Amino acid sequence: MAWRKAPKRNYFLYSIAGFVVLYVGFIAFRALYTSAVFARHDRINIAFYGDEATILSFGLTDNVNYIVSLSHEQKIMIPGGYNQYPMGSLGKLVEIEKDPDILQRTFSSMISAYVNYYVSPKKAEVFQKPDTDQPAYQKVDLIRRLFSSSNLTNMNVIDKFYIGFLIAKRRQQDYVVLRSSIRRDEEDGAHIFSEKSFLKKYKGFFYYQTLREEGMETQIKYNNYKSAVTLSRVIEGQGIRVADLSASDRNVSRCIIRTRAPRTSKTVDFIARSFSCDIETGETEGVDIIVYLGEEIESQWE
């Protein structure tokens, strides 16, 4: 029997199919690599914004869990040059700016620790619900919000199933309630969330024990001091020691981490993942890590 060549059309279809398989595999690998499952965090913090504003904090190594109770009636400081803004109108700001990561930066700044994920309605509205002594832990509703197409979130599908599992296995009594720290505005008497007071009251609550034990000293080099102060609070809130804030001698557009060791440490890995920093090896002037804040991150955290 004579051998027949496969039609060129078949080669084309096989090529397309192969490309699709590779692309799907790449997307799946990236989702797994960036997920909380792969990163193996000591603690995961999630902000739920909506009719009630709460932050859930899951202790994955110590099994100590927190629920941070927040009020829509208070004003909050929003990084990015927005200054004070009513909590209940935060969703409107996100919609106007078309930048949902404002939620992540805002809640991270509030608790002086890195908030990994956020969940918020896509359709913005103004919320007015006050703080409560015992915030409700409605696990079915929380899990539903994770998968609802009417909500926006920075979780991938693997994260959603993992976080849903964490929520499902915990009860109301498994959480320690952390209360808002409020100060009064001297001019109009408005309630303002005090980041300073909250940090003083709950310092160390959100530490990653692995980062604390690694004990790497970090220096932050900046061109914008206000951004450096905010970021240093968030980084220290993870258990990383910030030894110094200094004016930068480099102009960079993207955050850069300089480390002496060619092997990436857990501290370097955390900062790089959390703030999208590049990594380089070089002299670090007596500390373990130097973080050069670039224009991009400074404008976001100002």
Language model segments and positions:
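Non-catalytic, solvent-exposed segments at the cell envelope interface
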Residues: 2-302
